[in-house]
């Protein structure tokens, strides 16, 4: 299972692009990459455009990241979600907690 994380820091925003699969094997590495960024107190924008699969362990990572950015005064926006990922956040109720309104794939 492959996972790639690319990070770009600006003054108040950290932009992250995630590519690959987020599952039980890759979620710990993703958490290890994102948690220090979340604790900087900046706004965190995470593009999931190139994420081909995510399971519940991936959701758990984003819940933890959401809590960390809120503790430090930042915000979390997930961008470019596929229809499959939007549905995953919808059926779990997390779309009402985590902002997934960033640019959606397909212009939604």
Curated annotation (Swiss-Prot):
Chain positions with Phosphothreonine modification: 57
InterPro entries: Anti-sigma_ant, STAS_dom, STAS_dom_sf
Positions of modified residues (Phosphoserine): 52, 56
Post-translational note: Phosphorylated by RsbW on a serine residue.
Keyword set includes Phosphoprotein: yes
A GO molecular-function annotation: anti-sigma factor antagonist activity
Keywords recorded for this protein, A-Z: Phosphoprotein
Domain of life: Bacteria
Keyword match ATP-binding: no
Span of domain STAS: 3-108
Family indicated by similarity: Belongs to the anti-sigma-factor antagonist family.
Functional note: Positive regulator of sigma-B activity. Non-phosphorylated RsbV binds to RsbW, preventing its association with sigma-B. When phosphorylated, releases RsbW, which is then free to complex with and inactivate sigma-B.
Name by which UniProt lists this protein: Anti-sigma-B factor antagonist
Native organism taxonomy: Bacteria, Bacillati, Bacillota, Bacilli, Bacillales
Gene, per the UniProt record: rsbV
């Amino acid at each position: 299972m492959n996972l790639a994380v690319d990070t770009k820091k600006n003054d108040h925003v950290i932009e992250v692009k995630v590519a690959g699969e987020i599952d039980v094997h890759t979620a710990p590495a993703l958490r290890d990459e994102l948690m220090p960024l979340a604790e900087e107190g900046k706004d965190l924008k995470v593009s999931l455009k190139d994420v081909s699969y995510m399971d519940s362990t991936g959701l758990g990572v984003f819940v933890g990241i959401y809590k960390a950015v809120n503790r430090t005064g930042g915000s979390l926006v997930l961008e470019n979600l596929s229809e499959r990922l939007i549905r995953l956040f919808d059926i779990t109720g997390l779309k009402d907690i985590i902002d997934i309104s960033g640019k959606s794939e397909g212009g939604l």
